């Protein structure tokens, strides 16, 4: 089955007209398909049209899969924009993750910020730690009514010489500064408020996430 994209009747008619003259069953546009025309899927990343589901740990492996999905869908939607002279739908990124690697998270942050197609993020159930970095940079950010988010400090462990520990503290200070800067830019929180919140491991419900600017809208049930 072929899925088409359109944003208005004019574009829909144009797609259907081209399809009617197609003698080989070639579809006008298909977004990111796997073997046999099935949607591309992995354990942590599923793709269906302009919807990407990210359910898993923020790891280097999973970030690579997610970043590839974002780039592929973005590229295909930009092809659609040029071919049909119509604005494509946004990329809808659904997130359910307890977090993971801050470096992997920032890699996806940069991919989202460089997408030409708007990326809308949705919190499905929960997003914590590095996963909130990803959700926070969406062009529009949604959270479902019973979902929660958690932001907190970095965690790190190491062993070595005294100087190694000094270097590690400098590294951690640098990364924490990056995290605070992102939250400062993408929320309603002051630097002082961010510093205090990061000291705790406290979940925020949908209403609190909206209040502090982690999201833009609550998706209500029904």
Q: Model regions: which residues?
A:
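Terminal-region recognition feature
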Residues: 1-222
């Amino acid at each position: 089955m072929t899925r088409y994209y359109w944003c208005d009747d004019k574009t829909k008619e144009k797609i259907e007209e081209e399809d009617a003259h197609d003698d080989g069953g070639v579809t006008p546009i298909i977004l990111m398909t796997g073997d046999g025309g099935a949607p591309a899927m992995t354990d942590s990343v599923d793709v269906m049209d302009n919807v990407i589901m990210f359910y898993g740990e923020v790891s280097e492996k999973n970030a690579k899969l997610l970043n590839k999905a974002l780039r592929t869908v973005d590229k295909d939607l930009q092809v659609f924009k040029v071919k049909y002279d119509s604005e494509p739908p946004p990329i809808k990124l659904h997130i359910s993750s307890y977090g993971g690697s801050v470096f992997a998270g920032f890699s996806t942050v940069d991919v989202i910020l460089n997408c030409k197609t708007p990326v809308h993020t949705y919190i499905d159930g929960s997003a914590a730690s590095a996963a909130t970095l990803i959700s926070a940079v969406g062009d529009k950010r949604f959270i479902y009514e019973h979902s929660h988010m958690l932001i907190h400090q970095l965690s790190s462990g190491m062993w070595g010489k005294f100087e190694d520990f000094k270097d590690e503290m400098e590294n951690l200070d640098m990364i924490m500064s990056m995290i605070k800067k992102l939250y400062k830019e993408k929320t309603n929180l002051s630097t002082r408020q961010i510093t205090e919140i990061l000291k705790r491991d406290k979940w925020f419900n949908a209403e609190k996430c909206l209040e502090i600017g982690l999201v833009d809208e609550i998706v209500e049930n029904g």
